[in-house]
Curated annotation (Swiss-Prot):
On ligand binding, phosphorylated on two conserved C-terminal tyrosine residues (isoform B only) by JAK2. Tyr-984 is required for complete binding and activation of PTPN11, ERK/FOS activation and, for interaction with SOCS3. Phosphorylation on Tyr-1139 is required for STAT3 binding/activation. On ligand binding, phosphorylated on two conserved C-terminal tyrosine residues (isoform B only) by JAK2. Tyr-984 is required for complete binding and activation of PTPN11, ERK/FOS activation,for interaction with SOCS3 and SOCS3 mediated inhibition of leptin signaling. Phosphorylation on Tyr-1139 is required for STAT3 binding/activation. Phosphorylation of Tyr-1077 has a more accessory role. Residues 1-21 form the signal peptide. This is Leptin receptor. Residues 891-896 are annotated as: Required for JAK2 activation. GO terms for molecular function: cytokine binding; cytokine receptor activity; leptin receptor activity. Belongs to the type I cytokine receptor family. Type 2 subfamily. Receptor for hormone LEP/leptin. On ligand binding, mediates LEP central and peripheral effects through the activation of different signaling pathways such as JAK2/STAT3 and MAPK cascade/FOS. In the hypothalamus, LEP acts as an appetite-regulating factor that induces a decrease in food intake and an increase in energy consumption by inducing anorexinogenic factors and suppressing orexigenic neuropeptides, also regulates bone mass and secretion of hypothalamo-pituitary-adrenal hormones.
Length: 1163
């Protein structure tokens, strides 16, 4: 008892000693603390801030902390021997020193210093310890403060530590031998790193440590330190820092936790925003691995850093992550990309910044692919600067080349930025089909992706959830599901196997499409394994033809599983490469056989059987292996073979050799085979015998009796044929002749008509035998048996027209074979016809081919002539001069070209034109000599030809007395003195009845070309014009041929002559030049005018907007011609109408062209 009490006391004492040792140690804090060693009889305040020391900042990890600096100029030392200094710890929060003692052998470690440098000051070190993020090393950093007295001396630092398992039976203070020492790695900056390996299993235990520092020959030893490594973990910085704009328009900052951290972390996020309008900074602490920043603006820059620390309990902040910068675009779409399924509704948001100014959401419009403007009914104004567009019931996106999405553009009214949002719409309607095997042990599901659009980077996965019993009425996707591995098969389907299975559990499954833009699920389907059973095919399938009945009997055995009632389906058909199957259903679950009628008893039939649940659930099984019938004789042959004979021997003798010939029986006649043939003989002397000839089809015997009857029987495994043919050979009957005539008519090389005429007879005719052979060949005789009622027969065989054939007709009586009728050639008339027809075989195809060729040629010529007369040649009824004329009257053509009272609205065909210089002279005098030529006409007549260098002198128009105009002509100076390439010019006038004679006189003025008058052959051509004033027209040809003088012609004659002469001019330069044609006419007349087009070759109405009352000229044709020749400053109404070049097309679009592409010159 005393011993036990003593042991208990010792145990309590040891425990108290250990606890005391731990209590005397300094608990290391997660933040930095300081080791201070000071001289004796000095207060802590004096030590902390002596004379010549000041505060400075130093930091191991970036923070600035209070430190002591030493100024050597203000401090003096004296030599001291055996001076004891106290070392203690103090934290940043507590300025008082802790755990100091002056007894070397006492309760704490003290440092003894024999030096004169610590008379009035001590030494200081910053210490910070933590457990590395990988939880393997405990690290302590020791950093000497700036201006340390021994900073110029090399110093060494050692860390002594003891693990908890070594402290067994330890005294109050651990002995020196129980500590382990590690050497600390010191850098040139007086910063030392001490690494203590800590087992993972001891992270929650307490670790005792102390520091031993040697510097300048002085040894410093710190008091004990205690720490739990798990409370000093310093995680690694967060990884994968990234930023993105969310679907709600916020900036999402996200990152990943560092690995190997055994507890959750909290995070500190600091970010700054820099934009043209806002600059802000923020610092937030969150427990999640993401942070949302609202109020994002386009064209802004964000810089973010993150660090982590233990969420619950003590810990050390990690280092800051690498800064990450994110810049927003001028146009922000959120979300920037959307992946959705067919039939869904999605929305895009947009913020638009234009020239450092955010556009109002009311001014934003949306476009699809820059080709289709989205209706405003789909817009929503979220805020002043955020616009929203919604798409309803989307259709599948059709790929356009490499683009598999639709581009959605957010635009500032009519200005669109090049950035766009992407809309992916795919059809996720994937059909999943499942079947349970016949052993009810596994369920196989198959599905294909051929029906959906494949997106790059997408993966497909089948997911399912099993319910405890049956399926719900409406399957739905459960948030908790399991994936199933599926493998691609050679047929393009994916196949997944569920094994084991629960027959009555509902398996809800769907296909999940995983993509970086999101996930889509196909419509779910629920499968009950018991409802998709595919039974094993029926076994022991047999097929046979029943004897004497001829039915196809099929039998089978029902599979073991499932135990439900089954229905069966049979298919059968004639065996061959391609079997034409016939189907037969058996609904009686107890049936195991069935008999079916077949048309051919002697054919080989292939039979297969399959089964399915009779309640409609499940699937059809596979077809069983085919079973085949065996051809067997089911009955005796229906009849014997047809046969004929060949008689050889002297016709004068009584004995002849008769060879019987017959054709083998078909299967449908022999039912189903013939093993042998038997010939029965019966003679007139009542002699009867049989001969077995086996399978031969020829037999010869000797005919010696007056009458000899033979019968050929067919015998199979069941018996001999019942109905047989008899043939009697009789000498008397061989002389009976009832065939009067026999004729053969060849139709072609494969058919000959044989006809005959019979005479009356007392014998009963049974049938005929037709026999024929080629006389030029030693071939076998061919024969046919035909009915006795036939008088004409078509023989189908290969006949050569130049060969000779023998045809024989034998009448067969009951008493015997009659006398035959034999012919050796075809009928004479038909022979000649056939010989004539031989040439037709060559002539007729030639005639037919020639006729077809001639017909095709006529059709082509007809089309060309039709085009020539009806398309290339214009319809005269569409011409203006033909309006109101009746071409049905003969007198119309007599006066057609004599007189025209209406103005001509279209000129002759123009050749390649060139800018010209010309004058127009008047042949008829003015009534009023004082009147002047109208200004508009003068301006046209005085056109300056800048290109040719020719100037028309038109001053005479302002001074000449037009009463004397007949002897007056406008002169023109041509500097180049070369002949112009102008073919003609046109002047047309339709004066109103109220117009004065002076205006009409102008029309009769003479016309002079812009070249020397002495070289002009046309000077006097129009002096005595006899044209009507209402339809006067002048055609002025350039002086290309001096010998050609245009005579005075009527209008129609002049037009024809001009067209004839026009083709004689040489081709000119092909360079394109602007050309202008003017016609002078009244507005009233011109509005009803017509214009000739070069394509249609007909006259079409001249557009009213082309009247010079509202002058419109094509923009690319506006030139100095209009500026020089039209006095647009006058207010008088213009009476000129533009004559469009005939090389352009007059169409229904003329008005639109005039409105859109012509420059308005209206005064």
């Amino acid at each position: 008892m005393i011993c036990q009490k003593f042991c208990v006391v010792l145990l309590h004492w040891e425990f108290i000693c250990v606890i005391t040792a731990f209590n005397l140690s300094y608990p290391i804090t997660p933040w930095r603390f300081k080791l201070s060693c000071m001289p004796p009889n000095s207060t802590y305040d004096y030590f902390l801030l002596p004379a010549g020391l000041s505060k400075n900042t130093s930091n191991l990890n970036g923070h600035y902390e209070t430190a002591v600096e030493f100024n050597s100029s203000d401090t003096h030392f004296s030599n001291l021997s055996k001076t004891t200094f106290h070392c203690c710890f103090r934290s940043e929060q507590d300025r008082n020193c802790s755990l100091c003692a002056d007894n070397i052998e006492g309760k704490t470690f003290v440092s003894t210093v024999n030096s004169s440098v610590f008379q009035q000051m001590g030494a200081n070190w910053n210490i910070q310890c933590w457990l590395k993020g990988d939880l393997k090393l405990f690290i302590c950093y020791v950093e000497s403060l700036f201006k340390n007295p021994f900073k110029n001396y090399k110093h060494k630092v050692h860390l002594l530590y003891v693990l908890p398992e070594v402290l067994e039976d330890s005294p109050l203070v651990p002995q020196k031998g129980s500590f382990q020492m590690v050497h600390c790695n010191c850098s040139v900056h007086e910063r030392c790193e001490c690494l203590v390996p800590v087992p993972t299993a001891k992270l929650n235990d307490t670790l005792l440590m102390c520091l031993k520092i040697t510097s300048g020959g002085v040894i410093f030893q710190s008091p004990l330190m205690s720490v739990q490594p798990i409370n000093m973990v310093k995680p690694d910085p967060p990884l994968g820092l990234r930023m993105e704009i969310t679907d709600d328009g916020n900036l999402k900052i996200s990152w990943s936790s560092p690995p190997l951290v055994p507890f959750p972390l909290q995070y500190e996020v600091k970010y700054s925003e820099n934009s043209t309008t806002v600059i802000r900074e923020a610092d937030k602490i969150v427990s999640a691995t993401s942070l949302l920043v609202d109020g994002i603006l386009p064209g802004s820059s964000y810089e973010v850093q993150v660090r982590g620390k233990r969420l619950d309990g003590p810990g050390i902040w990690s280092d800051w992550s690498t800064p990450h910068v994110f810049t927003t675009q001028d146009v922000i779409y959120f979300p920037p990309k959307i992946l959705t399924s067919v039939g869904s509704n999605v929305s895009f948001h947009c913020i638009y910044k234009n020239e450092n100014k955010i556009v109002s959401s009311k001014k934003i419009v949306w476009w699809m692919n820059l080709a289709e403007k989205i209706p405003q009914s789909q817009y929503d104004v979220v805020s002043d600067h955020v616009s929203k567009v919604t798409f309803f019931n989307l259709n599948e996106t059709k790929p356009r080349g490499k683009f598999t999405y639709d581009a959605v553009y957010c635009c500032n009214e009519h200005e669109c930025h090049h950035r766009y949002a992407e809309l992916y719409v795919i059809d996720v309607n994937i059909n999943i089909s499942c079947e349970t095997d016949g052993h009810l042990t596994k369920m196989t599901c198959r599905w294909s992706t051929n029906t959906i659009q494949s997106l790059a980077g997408s993966t497909l996965q089948l997911r399912y959830r099993r319910s405890s019993l049956y399926c719900f009425d409406i399957p739905s996707i459960h948030p908790i599901s399991k994936p199933k591995d599926c493998y691609l098969q050679s047929d393009g389907f994916y196949e997944c196997v569920f094994q084991p299975i629960f027959l009555l559990s509902g398996y809800t499954m769907w296909i999940r499409i995983n993509h970086p833009l999101g996930s889509l699920d196909s419509p779910p389907t629920c499968v009950l394994p018991d409802s998709v059973v595919k039974p094993l095919p029926p076994s022991s399938v047999k097929a046979e033809i029943i004897k004497n009945i001829g039915l196809l009997k099929i039998s089978w055995e029902k599979p073991v599983f499932p135990e439900n009632n089954l229905q069966f389906q049979i298919r059968y058909g004639l065996s061959g490469k391609e079997i034409q199957w016939k189907m037969y259903d058996v609904y009686d679950a107890k049936s195991k056989s069935v008999s079916l009628p077949v048309p051919d008893f002697c054919a080989v039939y292939a039979v297969q059987v399959r089964c399915k649940r009779s309640d409609g659930l499940g699937l059809w099984s596979n077809w069983s292996n085919p079973a085949y019938t065996v051809v067997m004789d089911i009955k005796v042959p229906m009849r014997g073979p047809e046969f004929w004979r060949i008689i050889n021997g002297d016709t004068m003798k009584k004995e002849k050799n008769v060879t019987l010939l017959w054709k083998p029986l078909m299967k449908n006649e022999s039912l189903c085979s013939v093993q042998r043939y038997v010939i029965n003989h019966h003679t007139s002397c009542n002699g009867t015998w049989s001969e077995d000839v086996g399978n031969h089809t020829k037999f010869t015997f000797l005919w010696t009796e007056q009458a000899h009857t033979v019968t050929v029987l067919a015998i199979n495994s069941i018996g001999a044929s019942v109905a047989n043919f008899n043939l009697t050979f009789s000498w008397p009957m061989s002389k009976v002749n009832i065939v009067q005539s026999l004729s053969a008519y060849p139709l072609n090389s494969s058919c000959v008509i044989l006809s005959w005429i019979l005479s009356p007879s007392d014998y009963k005719l049974m049938y005929f035998i037709i026999e024929w052979k080629n006389l030029n060949e030693d071939g076998e005789i061919k024969w046919l048996r035909i009915s006795s009622s036939v008088k004409k027969y078509y023989i189908h065989d290969h006949f050569i027209p130049i060969e000779k054939y023998q045809f024989s007709l034998y009448p067969i009586f009951m008493e015997g074979v009659g006398k035959p009728k034999i012919i050796n050639s075809f009928a004479q008339d038909n022979t000649e016809k056939h010989q004539n027809d031989a040439g037709l075989y060559v002539i007729v195809p030639v005639i037919i081919s020639s006729s077809i060729l001639l017909l095709g040629t006529l059709l082509i010529l007809h089309q060309r002539m039709k085009k020539l007369f009806w398309e290339d040649v214009p319809n005269p009824k569409n011409c203006s001069w033909a309006q109101g004329l009746n071409f049905q009257k003969p007198e119309t053509f007599e006066h057609l070209f004599i007189k025209h009272t209406a103005s001509v609205t279209c000129g002759p065909l123009l050749l390649e034109p060139e800018t010209i210089s010309e004058d127009i002279s008047v042949d008829t005098s003015w009534k009023n000599k004082d009147e002047m030529v109208p200004t508009t006409v003068v301006s046209l007549l005085s056109t300056t030809d800048l290109e040719k260098g020719s100037v028309c002198i038109s001053d005479q128009f302002n001074s000449v007395n037009f009463s004397e105009a007949e002897g007056t002509e406008v002169t023109c100076e041509d500097e180049s003195q070369r002949q112009p390439f102008v073919k003609y010019a046109t002047l047309i006038s339709n004066s109103k009845p109220s117009e004065t004679d002076e205006e009409q006189g102008l029309i009769n003025s003479s016309v002079t070309k812009c070249f020397s008058s002495k070289n002009s052959p046309l000077k006097d051509s129009f002096s005595n014009s006899s044209w009507e004033i209402e339809a006067q027209a002048f055609f002025i040809l350039s002086d290309q041929r001096p010998n050609i003088i245009l005579p005075h012609l009527t209008f129609s004659e002049g037009l024809d002559e001009l067209l004839r002469l026009e083709g004689n001019f040489p081709e000119e330069n092909n360079d394109e030049k602007s050309i202008y044609y003017l016609g002078v006419t009244s507005i009233k007349k011109r509005e009803s005018g017509v214009l000739l087009t070069d394509k249609s070759r007909v006259l079409c109405p001249f557009p009213a907007p082309c009247l010079f009352t509202d002058i419109r000229v094509l923009q690319d044709s506006c030139s100095h011609f209009v500026e020089n020749n039209f006095n647009l400053g006058t207010s008088s109404k213009k009476t000129f109408a533009s004559y469009m070049p005939q090389f352009q097309t007059c169409s229904t679009q003329t008005h639109k062209i005039m409105e859109n592409k012509m420059c308005d010159l209206t005064v």
